[in-house]
Amino acid sequence: MAAADALANVRNIGIMAHIDAGKTTTTERILFYTGITYKIGEVHEGAAVMDWMAQEQERGITITSAATKCEWKGHTIQIIDTPGHVDFTVEVERSLRVLDGAVAVYDGVAGVEPQTENVWRQADKYNVPRMCFVNKLDRTGADFFRCVQMMVDRLNATPLVLQVPIGLEADHIGVVDLIDMRALTWRGETQKGEDYAVEEIPAELADTAAEWREKLMETLADVDDAVMEKYLEGGEFSVEEIKAAIRRATIAGKANPVLCGSAFKNKGVQPMLDAVVDFLPSPLDIPAIEGTGTDGETPLQRKPSTSEPFSGLAFKIQTDKHLGKLTYMRVYSGVLESGSQVVNSTKDRKERIGKIYQMHANKREERSSAKAGDIIAVQGLKQTTTGDTLCDPANPVILESMTFPEPVIEVAIEPKTKADQEKLSTAIQRLAEEDPTFRVKLDDETGQTVISGMGELHLDILVDRMRREFNVEANIGKPQVAYRETIRRKVEKVEYTHKKQTGGSGQYARVIVSLEPLPLDNDSPTYEFANAVTGGRVPREFIPSVDAGAQDAMQYGILAGFPLVGVKLTLVDGQYHEVDSSEMAFKIAGSMVLKDAARKADPALLEPMMAVEVTTPEENMGDVIGDINSRRGIIQAMEERGGARVVRALVPLSEMFGYVGDLRSKTQGRASYSMQFDSYAEVPASVAKEIIAKATGE
């Protein structure tokens, strides 16, 4: 029983938000109040504990999710601080996959921003229960209630407002707690915020507090039947009953508790920690994790208990100067001992566990074992990458992995010397292990190495890391759009025979395939392979070679040399020769048949479309819209926000280079914009013609 009790007191949470909403500052305050750090690290001093990479301290943004553990009122809170910049979506996606709950931090002035929406949707995808902290209420222009309304309008959230602020901007001194109906204030000399005073609710806020308390009870009644019954009968609710109902609604994903304050001014952080413990789930509150047997079909479950067989998911790889490769892992069931042997069921490879570390942002403590509910880093894994399952060899299971977006931008990189060339290949291999959205290919024609990623900042930082961590000196080309190719219709019975039977050992392979398009949304795979051969007409050992050959050919496309995506290849039939057939022969046949089939399947060019949001004064609205239209943009919505107009549009990335300068000159620097990848869409024929001609040099 003790083990289950201990798990009930664990909270695995992420802190997520838009860039600059104050996520890292909030996390730093949590570490301070829970006694992990003795001096608060300020982001703007470049001293935050969680921002441990050199680039993060220079740029004041969080790039990699730092993991850390702290204690609060008898509970263990494991926190992952995630980046808010859109180029690092992959880090957010990975963290959410292994968390039980999250705190969304909002900027009280800006409200719900584009990346907030993005992260919220990612959290919806993994059903992560979450609460909200409206931060920066000490800043000019802060508006708590507008921010709450935006949660409803933009996120489709059901906010449970548990606090209202006492004063805003310079007068922000505390919050009214609507559950206990009391005021919590941080005044005077307790600037560090260690102590807060509990007072009567100020008279001028009594009506507001009563109104929002009533709204809180109404919302709870809407989402919880037990509250509804008592509420309709006019019964009184104890504090315990209200808290239990909020917890039920939060864990079920029906509502989101909202708290507020100013982390930088040390106001509102302790009540937020209380809420994490009171309302966010422990590993026992969330459903058992679903997986499949090694056949990829039989459904299996793993409960969060130490008596179940061990299973865990690798969600991040990091290279440490002293320890080499570290694999971050969430343990879902059982116990993991250092030195034990486990199986990587995703790849069907054995792995030996080296040392196990409990991570703080940039320090670590060694542990002899880890158990269900832990988030740890493991040394010594050779074959494991992000999204792989590790499990007990006697009870294998494959847990659901993660899907990552296709990169949208690429640059050519040329090492300055021969020595740099060698260092570059090591650097690229390491960085690609750490980051699934970073891709590399060799351009056959120019001999250049081309790297691609999620945006200019992403590539800047990767190139910067190559220089700092691996001493690679290289020339970097101009950023190019990462176009893709796809097919529009299904083709059947396309065949290819590869034979070379002149003297010595020959080569022979014949394959017949069908090729069909897959949906191009972000949650669908970009490639699927199916084997429908019957009667051993192609021996089993050659089938993976056909798949491998096809995947090789896909890298170089058929129209203009861009990778082919969104296709499903089915091997229908084929033929082999007792002596002359080999894996190599079938690999070549797989590669050639894919090209032939794709040419017949009405190929098309795809380009990345960006969701662009421009905030502009009313008088520049016409210019902004005209400019978006001239860039082949599609206006999707226009709305008013805090006295300015907001235009939301989908615009091809190729038309967005240099946009920041144009927008500045059209609006005298008064407009701002943000953009993030939305989806791939077909390039209009006239534009496609130009791109293909340029790529093929015709």
From Swiss-Prot:
UniProt family annotation: Belongs to the TRAFAC class translation factor GTPase superfamily. Classic translation factor GTPase family. EF-G/EF-2 subfamily.
NCBIfam families named in the record: EF-G, PRK12740.1-3, PRK12740.1-5, small_GTP
Biological processes, Gene Ontology terms: ribosome disassembly
Protein's organism: Salinispora arenicola (strain CNS-205)
Gene name of this polypeptide: fusA
Domain tr-type G intervals: 8-284
Pfam families tied to this protein: EF-G_D2, EFG_C, EFG_III, EFG_IV, GTP_EFTU
Domain of life from the UniProt record: Bacteria
Region feature (Disordered): 289-309
Residue pairs linked by disulfide bridges in the UniProt entry: none
GO annotation, cellular component aspect: cytoplasm
Predominant location: cytoplasm
Role noted for this protein: Catalyzes the GTP-dependent ribosomal translocation step during translation elongation. During this step, the ribosome changes from the pre-translocational (PRE) to the post-translocational (POST) state as the newly formed A-site-bound peptidyl-tRNA and P-site-bound deacylated tRNA move to the P and E sites, respectively. Catalyzes the coordinated movement of the two tRNA molecules, the mRNA and conformational changes in the ribosome.
Classification via InterPro entries: EF-G-like_DII, EFG_II, EFG_III, EFG_III/V, EFG_IV, EFG_V, EFG_V-like, G_TR_CS
CDD domains: EF-G, EFG_III, EFG_mtEFG1_IV, EFG_mtEFG_C, EFG_mtEFG_II
Record's protein name: Elongation factor G
Binding site for GTP: 17-24, 81-85, 135-138
Molecular functions per Gene Ontology: GTP binding; GTPase activity; translation elongation factor activity
Keywords: Cytoplasm, Elongation factor, GTP-binding, Nucleotide-binding, Protein biosynthesis
Localisation per UniProt entry: Cytoplasm
